Amino acid sequence: MVDEKAEVIKKFRTADNDTGSAFVQVALFTRRINNLTRHLQGFKKDYSSRLGLLKIISKRRRLLNYLAKNDCQGCKNLMEMLDIRK
């Protein structure tokens, strides 16, 4: 799990020591969303995980809105790379 996170950070960072930019955060949220979605397909009545998933989706949406305002082309590229639909 830590290795996957490090790979995501390495792939989406903008500088060598960048771990918290909006691009990296969106990528990490997307990874967590995919993992929780897979979990919820097997455990349909896990309502606390479902609530956590909705919170993460909201955080990712707010970051994407920020990126759309400040770096429109970067946001579009990120959404294509992560296969996120608007």
UniProtKB/Swiss-Prot annotation:
Pfam families reported in the protein's UniProt record: Ribosomal_S15
Phylogenetic lineage: Bacteria, Pseudomonadati, Pseudomonadota, Alphaproteobacteria, Rickettsiales
Family: Belongs to the universal ribosomal protein uS15 family.
rRNA-binding recorded as keyword: yes
Top-level division of the source organism's lineage: Bacteria
Physiological role: One of the primary rRNA binding proteins, it binds directly to 16S rRNA where it helps nucleate assembly of the platform of the 30S subunit by binding and bridging several RNA helices of the 16S rRNA.
Protein name (database record): Small ribosomal subunit protein uS15
Molecular function via GO: rRNA binding; structural constituent of ribosome
GO biological process: translation
Keywords, alphabetical: Ribonucleoprotein, Ribosomal protein, RNA-binding, rRNA-binding
Assembly notes: Part of the 30S ribosomal subunit. Forms a bridge to the 50S subunit in the 70S ribosome, contacting the 23S rRNA.
A GO cellular-component term linked to this record: cytosolic small ribosomal subunit
NCBIfam families per UniProt: S15_bact
